[in-house]
């Protein structure tokens, strides 16, 4: 049976400012298709902490799902950690992610900025799953 870890990243999760519904929904959907969730965690926005926790998840599970820490603010450093962990040489611009970001922001009446465009940069050897 395929196993999965779910790691939620964000200080706002830890302090209760934002309710973590992502890991709940991800766990439900993975369970429906026969994936065993063998580890879930929530951590803050610290690079060393993210890297350490993701290394733990990689050792525990076949698949690691990461949610959070991918927004447009300076403390959103998940992709920096993923780049380091995956030994990636750099980032690639994802047209698919750019379209998703544009759709979400346009629907909310928010202007797209350079910071939002940077959200479409993903580590070369990571796969992004829309939530």
Feature map (PLM): residue ranges:
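An anion/phosphate-binding loop that grips the pyrophosphate of nucleotide cofactors and donors
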Residues: 61
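Short beta->alpha junction loops
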Residues: 39-49
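Glycine-rich phosphate/diphosphate-binding loop of Rossmann-like nucleotide-binding domains
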Residues: 1-40
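Proline/glycine-rich low-complexity loops and linkers
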Residues: 76-131
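Short glycine-rich anion-binding loops that position phosphate/pyrophosphate groups of nucleotides
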Residues: 11-12, 69-72
């Amino acid at each position: 049976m395929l196993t999965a870890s779910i790691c939620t990243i964000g200080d706002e999760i830890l302090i209760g400012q934002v309710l973590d519904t992502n890991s709940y929904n991800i766990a439900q959907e993975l369970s429906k298709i026969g994936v065993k969730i063998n580890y879930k965690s929530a951590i803050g926005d610290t690079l060393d902490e993210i890297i350490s926790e993701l290394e733990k998840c990689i050792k525990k599970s076949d698949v690691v799902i990461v949610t959070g820490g991918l927004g447009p603010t300076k403390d959103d450093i998940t992709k920096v950690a993923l780049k380091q962990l995956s030994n990636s040489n750099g980032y690639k611009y994802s047209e698919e992610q750019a379209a998703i970001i544009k759709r979400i922001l346009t629907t909310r009446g928010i202007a797209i900025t350079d910071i939002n465009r940077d959200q479409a940069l993903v580590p070369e050897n990571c796969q992004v799953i829309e939530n």
